[in-house]
Amino acid sequence: MKILAIQNRMGIGDMVIFLPFIEAISKKFNSPVSILVKENSKALEYLEKNKYIEKILILERGNNNSHHDGIIGSFNLAKDLKKYSFEKVFIFNSSLRFHLICKIAGIKEIFQYPLFQKKQQHLIKTAQNFIKKELDMDIDSNPIIELENSLIENAKNKYNINSDQINILLGIGGSGPTKRISAYKFLNFMKMATKEDDCKFFLATGTNEEEQIILNEILNSEFKERCVPLDKIKIKETLPIIKNCTVAICNDSSFSHLSAALDIPTIVLLSDTPLMYGSYSPNMYPIIPDGEETVTHDTLGKERINPEKIFKIFKEIVT
């Protein structure tokens, strides 16, 4: 059976969050599912070997002349999808556009969120209700990314990862300046951690200028000999490194989602993002700004993330 799932939200985090629901479709019909996703989901880097996913199709949208943009782009997308002869499609949004595209593509069975109800949709609960309604399945929010043991062992050898040390992923990047906790906060935690334990730190970030400033501040600190930067390698190559870690401490970034999905206890520093993004997985331990009962967009609390709270949860995890 040829089945398509459309997940058009941006970013790695959203793609990871939707994994359990896509896998549920595959299990229900005993058939791998193809997915249509945006390029910035980076799905090809961490889902290529997922047994529940057959093909990863890229939605080419984003600027005015992209292949799938506008009215002409809609017909281009319908034409592209028609080549695969999909029998069913599950659309994880309320867009009439995607509904019509799938009709034009000749897909007979179309399952979709209620049309025109995008406002105030809860990211996870809406997906859970959708799968319950269409497939009568109750799905927990616990994404899992599996890796081959050989990849994990190769990374352990290549990066001299010692199991006698506490190996810590520090996800110091973030999708915006209000989500990036200062280097000072991470250094404060590192000082507390190394006073009590032999630690090694893997610094995960992108190449954005501000992220590089934070990275270099840590690399130029007293802990530089304990640090391994990961900014120059692909996400695909970071996964087995992360899997070798004892714990992850991350801003709200792609790495908080990836590490939790790799079954690594992940402390998520939420300064300006809805709490749900750092608490949906049982592997996540959210920390919010001092003085707040919750956190959302425009909380602007990165200066009130407390390193002592990070250290307290860290010790609870590693002891």
Question: Which residues fall in each region the model found?
Answer:
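Catalytic machinery of carbohydrate-active enzymes
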Residues: 1-319
